Amino acid sequence: MQGAEVRCGGAEHLGPAGTFIAPTVLTGVRADMNVVREEVFGPVVVAIAFDEPEEVVTMANDTEYGLAASVWTESLSAAHRLAADIRAGTVWINSHSMYDASLPIGGVKQSGWGRDSGHQAVENYLETKTICAVI
């Protein structure tokens, strides 16, 4: 884990939901560590201390990936400000991995282009034809 401290979890876990690691919280994490720089597909929280909310946005956006993010706070207005500035396809507030088939799913940057689900995805299945005529 490149020096990060496993505060809880961390054991291998082949769960029914396709997870490969038990829910894990990591602390003592630096911005240059792989667990911060790469996409982590698992129930992993990377806890990094910060002084100002702007630092959170800078850290969150300082990666080539942007599939999803979670903002956890008591201040809903602060959460909305952060969510608007974080470059990710989905930002959850005080939750994670909430899905609804009516909402678009997709990332930004190297995490993908386009959207699945929602009305945006319907365009992928349409074959639009343009017909022009001189009358």
Enumerate the predicted regions with their spans:
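Conserved C-terminal structural/oligomerization subdomain of aldehyde/semialdehyde dehydrogenase
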Residues: H13, F20-I135
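Short secondary-structure junctions
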Residues: G3-E12
